[in-house]
Amino acid sequence: MDHYLDIRLRPDPEFPPAQLMSVLFGKLHQALVAQGGDRIGVSFPDLDESRSRLGERLRIHASADDLRALLARPWLEGLRDHLQFGEPAVVPHPTPYRQVSRVQAKSNPERLRRRLMRRHDLSEEEARKRIPDTVARALDLPFVTLRSQSTGQHFRLFIRHGPLQVTAEEGGFTCYGLSKGGFVPWF
């Protein structure tokens, strides 16, 4: 995880930045699934936590070899005109680290009740007692909107940037490039 590549969204009057970032992130996810492995992480250096926005830059963190392999894939077809690429570069030192991870909200009590009813053979009334409407939790985190390849449903993938740390701990990344224990340099 000693190299990185910045991909910046170009201003576009037809597409808002959040929409372009969602498309870019979805294409990256597909490329990471095809490439396999758990050694590529992402961060959003232009993050604006006060407004829950990821910003207009996606940073991909990897070794030089993993970054070269990713860039050799044709995963950005149809999107290149909307993007500006930096050159792969070495991570500056010293730099702090942080986890960039997915957060799943338990925001839909109705869905949770249906799941509980299916799994435990409960009536709707019993499920409502166990999961009242008050359990709904809205997240105030930035997100990308993706489309599930298996169901076709659109969903929000909420992203949390954890606190800064002096050192990185060992861990990997998901096929979204998000932490499953791994840390990325933050600069």
From Swiss-Prot:
**Gene name for this UniProt entry:** cas6f
Q: Could you say what the effect of mutating residue 29 to K is?
A: Cleaves pre-crRNA 130-fold slower
From what superkingdom does this record's organism come? Bacteria
- Annotated protein name in UniProt: CRISPR-associated endonuclease Cas6/Csy4
The effect of residue 104 to A is: No loss of pre-crRNA cleavage, still binds crRNA
Annotated phenotype, changing residue 148 to A: Cleaves pre-crRNA 8300-fold slower
Q: What happens when the gene is disrupted?
A: Infection with phage DMS3 inhibits biofilm formation; disrupting this gene restores biofilm formation despite DMS3 infection. Normal biofilm formation in the absence of phage infection. Loss of production of crRNA in the presence or absence of phage. Disruption of the entire Y.pestis-subtype CRISPR region disrupts crRNA production but does not alter phage resistance (possibly OLNs PA14_33350 to PA14_33310, plus the flanking CRISPR loci), indicating this CRISPR is not involved in phage resistance.
Q: Which organism is it from?
A: Pseudomonas aeruginosa (strain UCBPP-PA14)
Q: Which family does it belong to?
A: Belongs to the CRISPR-associated endoribonuclease Cas6 family. Cas6f/Csy4, subtype I-F/Ypest subfamily.
